[in-house]
């Protein structure tokens, strides 16, 4: 019976490798962020359970990598040696090496000595152990395979595992023997053996079948996607069924996976367990921390195959690729306009809803986009972060700087299709095109007079209101138009920017120069514009 107990405990010892899942680099690259996060959670949870049960005394390399947010495929699968790992299942195609034979003999002796300390009978134990050893050798080629019953489940056992872990908690003090004095009674051995099998059964439910067994693939009946684990298939099928069994008790939102619910609940609790060691910024998800770390490292692992542009996140790459494909999968149900990314359609939909969630805390004005609020706040702060390198003039918006720089470059990218006249700004082109169309959309509500642009209407309305917002700082005289003030100020400065090319005579106003030039071309003189005289 001592031999039976020894073999049962030796064979049923659960190792970290028994519940670990390995990925190659190619397989890891195929997983999305949520799948990688689920894998990380399961592996870390399995490790914590084995530690709490006393089944692992050293930290495996894959756990160290996962805790650092690194990819687990960096770990090469090796046969772990020592009490932490115990024996690995050896495939039928692998031969036992002399080193493995020595390890088997060493472990046999170690267990015999342990049984001796518990005063168990083992008069012929060594011979029986050698004769019956727990490796079954094939004649001729010395190949071996671990005699272990492979247990599989058709249904995932995630919800039931916790209770089973507790039921085997009495074994946590020693990975080989119970802490209580072992009494060689058949019923006690049977009870402990059953508990250990139950615990291992639950762990086996979340790992692939042993490498000794033929790998059985499970296919989804809806999309024919293939899985190696029944639990993965069960999770996947919820995509088709729409089943979301995990519900948040705070807001009622439901999820198809427990890990997604745990992540969501951190919104309510404010928990952010993942902290950046560089800047101390904290995150609710490990995947978000991994993405953030690339800000410090500058790593951009996702590269566009078309233009070779690189990105720090796969989502950014996917969004960028739509520039090349022209794909616009997000369509507005109100007007049918399509967008290449989700954030753009969310912003666009506020046009229809009138939603303006971003409010200025100084004047209370609200905006549909955060960027609009940021630009607006510079009115209050006076901030002008965009400076022209040519003349030093600063602007509150980058677009205004871009428009201004065309003064220096002379660039006029907006061309009229009717007369081929070009403009530096699209607004100027739109205003010009009304010359050809005759459109005058801006009408004065006082007199009904219409104008082709809003600035002309604004200036005209001052005729009715008598408003003169432009005041000379020298003499205090006020004007309705900014241009009129500029002309007036030349009286004080003596500036005469308009010069006749024939006689070199200068003038304060362009209209006066035009009137003067008629002397040289022989045109009849006419009195200056009365408006200009009034300005002077």
Swiss-Prot record:
Gene that encodes it: ZNF570
Kindly state one GO CC term assigned in the UniProt record: nucleus
* Pfam families on file: KRAB (PF01352), zf-C2H2 (PF00096)
Assigned protein family: Belongs to the krueppel C2H2-type zinc-finger protein family.
Q: Mostly located where? A: nucleus
Q: Where are the zinc fingers (C2H2-type)?
A: 218-240, 246-268, 274-296, 302-324, 330-352, 358-380, 386-408, 414-436, 442-464, 470-492, 498-520
Q: Where in the cell is it found?
A: Nucleus
The protein's job, in short, is: May be involved in transcriptional regulation.
Q: Give an example GO biological process.
A: regulation of transcription by RNA polymerase II
The record places domain KRAB at 14-85
Cited PROSITE patterns = KRAB, ZINC_FINGER_C2H2_1, ZINC_FINGER_C2H2_2
Q: What CDD domains does the annotation carry?
A: KRAB_A-box
Task: Give GO MF terms, alphabetically.
Answer: DNA-binding transcription factor activity, RNA polymerase II-specific; RNA polymerase II cis-regulatory region sequence-specific DNA binding; zinc ion binding
Keywords attached to this entry = DNA-binding, Metal-binding, Nucleus, Repeat, Transcription, Transcription regulation, Zinc, Zinc-finger
Name recorded for this polypeptide: Zinc finger protein 570
């Amino acid at each position: 019976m001592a031999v039976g107990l020894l073999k049962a405990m030796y064979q049923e010892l659960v190792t970290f490798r028994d519940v670990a899942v390995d990925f190659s680099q190619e397989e890891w690259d195929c997983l999305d962020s949520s799948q990688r996060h689920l894998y990380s959670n399961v592996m870390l949870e399995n490790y914590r359970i084995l530690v709490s049960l006393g089944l692992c005394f050293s930290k495996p390399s894959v756990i160290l990598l996962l805790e650092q947010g690194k990819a687990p495929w960096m770990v090469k699968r090796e046969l772990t040696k020592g009490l932490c790992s115990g024996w690995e299942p050896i495939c039928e195609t692998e031969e036992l090496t002399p080193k493995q034979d020595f390890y088997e003999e060493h472990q046999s002796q170690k267990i015999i000595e342990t049984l001796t300390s518990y005063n168990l009978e083992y008069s012929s134990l060594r011979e029986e152990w050698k004769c019956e050893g727990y490796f079954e050798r094939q004649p001729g080629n010395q190949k071996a395979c671990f005699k272990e019953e492979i247990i599989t489940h058709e249904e995932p056992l995630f919800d039931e595992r916790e209770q089973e872990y507790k039921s085997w908690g009495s074994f946590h003090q020693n990975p080989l023997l119970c802490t209580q004095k072992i009494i060689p009674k058949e019923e006690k051995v049977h009870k402990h053996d059953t508990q250990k099998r139950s615990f291992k059964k639950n762990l086996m439910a979340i790992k692939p079948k042993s490498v000794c067994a033929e790998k059985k693939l499970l296919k989804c009946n809806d999309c024919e996607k293939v899985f190696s684990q029944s639990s993965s298939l069960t999770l996947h099928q919820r995509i088709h069924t729409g089943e979301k069994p995990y519900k948040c008790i705070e807001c009622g939102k439901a999820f198809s996976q427990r890990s997604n619910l745990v992540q969501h609940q951190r919104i309510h609790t404010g928990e952010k367990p993942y902290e950046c060691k560089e800047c101390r910024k904290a995150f609710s998800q490990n995947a978000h921390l991994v993405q953030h770390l690339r800000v410090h490292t500058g790593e951009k692992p996702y590269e566009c195959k078309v233009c070779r542009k690189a990105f720090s996140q796969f989502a950014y790459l996917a969004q960028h690729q739509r520039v090349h494909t022209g794909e616009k999968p997000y369509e507005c149900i109100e007007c049918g306009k399509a967008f290449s990314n989700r954030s753009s359609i969310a912003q666009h939909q506020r046009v229809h809803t009138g939603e303006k969630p971003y409010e200025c805390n100084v004047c209370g004005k609200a905006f549909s986009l955060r960027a609009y609020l940021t630009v607006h706040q510079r009115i209050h702060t006076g901030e002008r972060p965009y400076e022209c390198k040519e003349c030093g003039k600063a602007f509150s918006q980058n677009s205004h700087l871009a428009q201004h720089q065309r003064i220096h470059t002379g660039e006029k990218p907006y061309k009229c299709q009717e007369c081929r006249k070009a403009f530096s700004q699209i607004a100027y082109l739109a205003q010009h095109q009304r010359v050809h169309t005759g459109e005058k959309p801006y009408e004065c509500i006082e007199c009904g007079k219409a104008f082709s642009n809003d600035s002309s209407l604004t200036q005209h309305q001052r005729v009715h209101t008598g408003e003169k917002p432009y005041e000379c700082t020298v003499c205090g005289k006020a004007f309705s138009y900014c241009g009129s003030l500029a002309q007036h100020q030349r009286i004080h400065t003596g500036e005469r920017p308009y010069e006749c090319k024939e006689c070199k005579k200068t003038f304060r106003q362009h209209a006066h120069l035009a009137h003067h030039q008629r002397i040289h071309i022989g045109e009849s003189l006419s009195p200056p514009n009365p408006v200009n005289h009034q300005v002077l």
